[in-house]
Amino acid sequence: MTIRKARPSDIPVLNELLQDILQVHHQARPDIFKSEGQKFSEAKLVALLENPDKPIFVFELEGQVVGHLFCEFRTTSGDVLEPIKTLFIDDLCVASSVRGQKIGEQLYEFALSYAKEQGCHNLTLDVWADNAGAVRFYERQGMKPQKFRMEQIIS
């Protein structure tokens, strides 16, 4: 088991895992998410891999990439906000073939340790309210709601 920075050679597997996430989101919210498509083009993924503010990590099991962790450093600013450095988890995904082996927990713990090493105040992420499994997973990791985004569908 290894968690390491993603490399350009990982792009095909990253895209497969991103497709898994898209399907989960499409099933929960087909009014928002398309049934197919790419979140990032190959060129965009290459650029992300080179961006130190948006690190991407992969989980290798027996030489195969079976999970990923897309992160982003964010800093709050403004007249009423304290300047806080945050590590935001944009995507955390584990291949369905290896779920239940605590790989998600290991990726999350890695993100938490990485955030501490980088001097972050907190670790944050967004999770869709309809994704009850993900909500439970993150609550088990110790996360608590920071705020709620509400919606009323008009059409």
Where are these regions (language model features)?
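Conserved GNAT-fold acetyl-CoA-binding loop/helix
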Residues: 22-45
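Conserved acetyl-CoA-binding loop-helix of GNAT-fold acetyltransferases
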Residues: 91-94, 100-113, 140
